[in-house]
Amino acid sequence: MSETKSGKAIHEGWLLGVLAAIQFTAVLDFMIIMPLGPQYMRVFHIDPSQFGLIVSAYAIAAGIAGIIAGFFIDRFDRKRAMLVLYAGFTLGTLFCAMAPSYQTLVAARVVAGAFGGVTMGLVMAVIGDVIPEIRRGRAMGIVMSSFSVASICGVPIGLYLANEMDWHIPFYALAGLCVFVTLGVAKVMPSLRGHIDRVAQQPPAEMMAGILKEASNRRALMFMATLICTGFCVFPFLATYMVKNVGLTEKQLPWIYICGGVCTLVSMNLIGRWADRAGKRRVFTIMMLASMIPVLIVTNLPHVAVWIALTISTIFMVCSSGRIVPAMAMLTASVEPHQRGGFMSINSSVQQLSSGVAAWLSGVIIGQSGGHMTRFGIVGGLSVIFGLAAIYLARFLKTTGAGTAVQGIVET
């Protein structure tokens, strides 16, 4: 069994578990906002555009913070950076729980987003540093399964707590969970400093320019922007559409996340293994093309039986999540190791800003008439266009072959 410099053996499985827990809390913090929209509108007496600001505040703050962090994130031990960033995210979540008004909630979302967005980017950088290329698809599948677990457990439990007690309670519970995850990071995650030796001692702006001057890095960021826009044209408005147009009640909304989460929990790991065997670009292309069918169906769905709505929304979630796993594996492999932390921080910013732009653009397109959403089908078509662009850009991603195991990380 290998050891770190401190003499402490670290198992790859334990590390992936901690990274998945970090990702779970960050994802849940973002996901729980959308189905709580009706409650926020009633409690704060706000309109949909004001609710949209609650959502976009997180994304915009995360994007800006990620750009700033990209200037210096590669100069620090990954573990130390993770502990500091995650502590900030925990405080931001606690501030959300304590928010007494609409304005303070928006401010708290800015804090949570600023730290949470960079944290998620750092998780991907750690995976790229410690997981060999041959197993990276599987590792991405495990960590990205946090989306499914958040859907299966986090969102339904959060909605139950909000419905039975108060909308503040889910954030108090999440902040408490973050404390335990922080202890896990301190216990399990090793000191990762190998990348520092490869970072040239240069001004931060010059280092950032060095990352962005690489055409392959710019194409990779464009690829991720189109991929995120593909999903976030639709996701923020899915729950509202299901209630207003398809006929689900607010109490039935958790079933969308439960059914979709259970299936994606299984499918993402299978797709990760498939990508390792069959090739990540090939699997990405297949999953992206497959996802276009349920996108067009779900955005044009009329009033149907609950089981039909849940079946279609579940297929939509499985296909949508399935394209993320090979995409992230391709992305981490396309960046040189000494640039990976900074690049993934920039990438996290691109993801957040892209999600905000996509949600804003869809909000401009979508209308309301007679209590129903209109023009959601146009949004579905826009999602397909972004998807085709992502397939085209994926052809230009390079593979560095980087990602050998770090000393002290052993596969379980």
Predicted regions and their residues:
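Cytoplasmic helix-loop-helix junction between adjacent transmembrane helices
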Residues: 108-149
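Juxtamembrane intracellular "pre-TM" segments in multi-pass secondary transporters
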Residues: 2-9, 190-222
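C-terminal transmembrane helical hairpin of 12-TM major facilitator-type secondary transporters
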Residues: 281-327
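A membrane-interface helix-boundary motif in multi-pass transporters
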Residues: 163-175, 364-385
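Extracytoplasmic gate region of multi-pass secondary transporters
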Residues: 34, 217-258
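Helix-breaking motifs and short loop linkers at transmembrane-helix boundaries and internal kinks
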Residues: 45, 77, 98-104, 247, ...
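Helix-loop-helix hairpin linking two adjacent transmembrane segments in secondary transporters
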Residues: 142-189
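Conserved MFS/SLC helix-loop-helix module at the cytosolic interface between two early adjacent transmembrane helices
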Residues: 64-103
